[in-house]
Amino acid sequence: DTLVIATADHSTGGMTIAKGKDYKWNPEAIHKMKHSGMYMTKEIAAGKDPEKVINEGYGIDFPSKQMDKVKQAAKDLRKLQKEGKDDKDPKVAEATTKLQNAIQEPINDASHTGWTTNGHTGEDVNTYAYGPGSSKFKGNMENTKSAQNIFDFFKNDVTSNQNQQ
């Protein structure tokens, strides 16, 4: 008697697998990671040693030139933090993004993973539904229709009509 819905309001990233001329993807490089790029970014932003965080978080060799980029990005971020700027400051957000990009670049290169954007993308997102009323969430639909279906669910007693599954 419970409707379960799993969906997203948008997609992000525009992930490309097998970037580059060889058209091969290497997910094994990703599987070797011990921490995500976001986790490592947060650790470094919180003041932890960049080299230690990277060495503990990466399961692949991290290029020394890239480590220099990470250290510089961390230094730039710490300077802003010492000036009293917080996460809401646009300069801090920009510096944090620069740090995360420096951390992510080697794993993207090693795995041959590309990204079309750091923002939202326009492709359809999946919606999964199970239970009474789930038939209203099948096929392609505008996101506003999904919202309307949820509102309709609360207006009506769909639990009494098991034929809607």
Regions inferred by a protein language model and the residue ranges of each:
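A post-motif C-terminal structural segment
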Residues: 1-164
